[in-house]
């Protein structure tokens, strides 16, 4: 097995870096800074970054098949025209006060799933929900009673939906109906250990194993959702790890975003790479290309 290497490749720091998505056509990484209210693209070829400001706190960004991107910002879905630098609202969700969209991803049929979170971030507050934007621009609400909606992905056969509500400290699974987008048979596939931090973003590899970013845990875990076992831990030089995705040639590199929000000067001095985006090579596994929203 080749040796694992962790490298800070995007040194421009994000207060809350999130939602990394690999764009194969131009070898670039798409991501957001939630509290910085911007969407960015980093070219792995030129090392240059292009950014665009959003109008609200932006939880996530996904590619759109028709061109440009779709974001979930504030309590709405919106289209992004990267060329014109314009944002067009598509659909608003009827959320409780003091909530906003957080992480999201496109399913294999082209639906854009995204969940919300309470800005209070208290264990007893369950005001959030999971939604998806349909290709016809209508919105489906799947379930509520969520603390802090976060990482999500689908099994390789598209029959299982994996989901993280961060403050539940677990990874869950649902039976998934790819024809309707329906969810059923909710169950737990992994419970976080105390030293692993808060489960945040997540992605899947070609072996069907899950990679879970651990906020305040300084690591990414590889989990077998069939057995509930942790298979591997990759430690990072930053505590506030937020999300991850595979990219690079053959999708063999793991890109990992991080945050520096809430860290004081002493903590930042100890973790000078907090807020950086890392690339991990030598893992010996590959990911799958992201899906694009079809609406």
Swiss-Prot record:
Location of the protein in the cell: Cytoplasm
Residues binding a divalent metal cation: 18, 150, 200
Predominant location: cytoplasm
Keywords for this protein: Ascorbate biosynthesis, Calcium, Cytoplasm, Hydrolase, Metal-binding
Origin superkingdom: Eukaryota
Family: Belongs to the SMP-30/CGR1 family.
Record's protein name: Regucalcin
Source species: Danio rerio
Lineage: Eukaryota, Metazoa, Chordata, Craniata, Vertebrata
The encoding gene: rgn
């Amino acid at each position: 097995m080749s040796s694992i290497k962790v490298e800070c490749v995007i040194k421009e720091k994000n207060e809350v870096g999130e939602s990394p998505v690999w764009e194969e056509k131009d070898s670039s990484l798409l991501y957001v800074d939630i509290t910085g209210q911007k969407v960015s693209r980093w070219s792995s070829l030129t090392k240059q970054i292009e950014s665009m400001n959003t109008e609200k706190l932006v939880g996530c960004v996904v590619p759109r098949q028709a061109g440009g991107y779709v974001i979930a910002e504030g309590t709405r879905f919106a289209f992004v025209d990267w060329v014109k630098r314009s944002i067009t609202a598509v659909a608003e969700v009827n959320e409780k006060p003091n909530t906003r969209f957080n992480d999201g991803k496109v399913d294999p049929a082209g639906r854009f799933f995204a969940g919300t979170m309470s800005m209070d971030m208290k264990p007893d507050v369950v005001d959030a929900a999971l939604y998806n934007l349909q290709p016809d621009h209508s919105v489906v609400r799947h379930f509520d009673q969520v603390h802090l909606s976060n990482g999500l992905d689908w099994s390789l056969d598209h029959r299982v939906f994996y989901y993280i509500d961060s403050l539940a400290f677990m990874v869950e699974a649902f039976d998934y109906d790819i024809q309707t987008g329906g969810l059923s048979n909710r169950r737990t596939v992994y419970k976080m250990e105390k030293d692993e931090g808060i489960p945040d973003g997540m992605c899947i590899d070609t072996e069907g194993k899950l990679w879970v970013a651990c906020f305040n845990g300084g690591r990414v875990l590889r989990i077998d959702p069939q057995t509930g076992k942790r298979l591997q831990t990759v430690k990072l030089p930053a505590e506030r790890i937020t999300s991850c995705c595979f990219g690079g040639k053959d999708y063999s590199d793991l890109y990992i975003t991080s945050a520096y929000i809430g860290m004081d000067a002493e903590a930042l001095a100890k973790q000078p790479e907090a807020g950086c985006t890392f690339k991990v090579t030598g893992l010996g596994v590959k990911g799958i290309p992201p899906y694009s929203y079809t609406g």
